[in-house]
Amino acid sequence: MNRTRALVCLFLAVLILAHESEAQCRRLCYRNRCVTYCRGRGKRSVEEPSGGAQVVEKRAVDDADIPSAVEERELDEEESIEFR
């Protein structure tokens, strides 16, 4: 029983690591504000420099809020967002 439990735990750990490695992150910047979206992790960080310091805020976000490739292409055409 302990051997089976250990194998199940190992299998779950591998699945979690595989999911984390598939996270796709994109960094979008507009004026003085940069947003990093990580698709696989479901998190994003918002960076807004104020004065000389940077404030980084992390919060959970739905994958539906992440721009698709088509939306990113439209933003590129408008040239309103700089990709870094």
Curated annotation (Swiss-Prot):
UniProt signal peptide: 1-23
Residue positions where Pyrrolidone carboxylic acid is found in the record: Q24
Expression across tissues: Expressed by the venom gland.
Propeptide position ranges: 42-84
Key words, A-Z: Amidation, Antibiotic, Antimicrobial, Disulfide bond, Pyrrolidone carboxylic acid, Secreted, Signal
Disulfide bond residue pairs: C25-C38, C29-C34
Residue numbers bearing the Arginine amide modification: R41
GO biological process: defense response to bacterium
Subcellular location: Secreted
GO cellular component terms attached to this protein's record: extracellular region
Task of the protein: Antibacterial peptide.
Protein name: Gomesin-like peptide
Species of origin: Hadronyche infensa
